[in-house]
Amino acid sequence: HVDIVPTLLDILEIETATKYDGRSLMQQVNSHDDELEQEFYITECTWMRKHGWRTPEWKLIIALEPDFHFKPEIELYNLKDDPNELKNLVDLRLDMVSVLKEKMDKWIAKRKKETGMDSPIFEQGDWHGIQGHGSFKSSQEAYDSLYIGDANTAKRLQEKSR
């Protein structure tokens, strides 16, 4: 999201002296695949706080609190062999977990040094909207605490849309 304003300014050919945390993505839009960044930091904060590192071949996901789908704390997928991410290879490829985690940690440290700020993913304990609650302690607590809806409401909504 930090790249949206710089990208829009670039598209509209508007120059400004304002410094932004992000950068224009027009170079990526106009480039060939071999010029694009091949590895990057990923975050997920919709229902659970997770972060990870992705390469063209691998995807590492680390949960920062228990997952309400009861997924493991660490997930590793080979995206070429398993594009649907069905086979977690953590136990078989601890070497790759270490390599990717080190790359991720270096990137996080670099961004903190550049901006002087920690990532909000680490600092916003009440990110899920339950004031004063903080991080979940178990998958069951996460599941019980988040309103996901109930089956009867879902059924009524589905019937209305027909």
PLM regions and their residue ranges:
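Non-transmembrane alpha-helical segments in soluble domains
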Residues: V5-L9, E13, M26, Y77, ...
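Long, internal low-complexity/basic segments
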Residues: L89-R162
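Acidic-residue sensor for enzyme active/binding pockets
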Residues: E44, E75, E85
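Short phosphate-engaging motifs
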Residues: R49, E85, M96
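Active-site donor-binding loop signature of nucleotide-sugar glycosyltransferases
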Residues: Q27, E44, T55, A63, ...
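Low-complexity, glycine/alanine/valine/leucine- and proline-rich hydrophobic stretches
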Residues: H51-E75
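Intrinsically disordered, low-complexity polar regions and short flexible loop motifs
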Residues: D82
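Polar, surface-exposed loop/tail segments
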Residues: H1-W53, E102, G116-P120
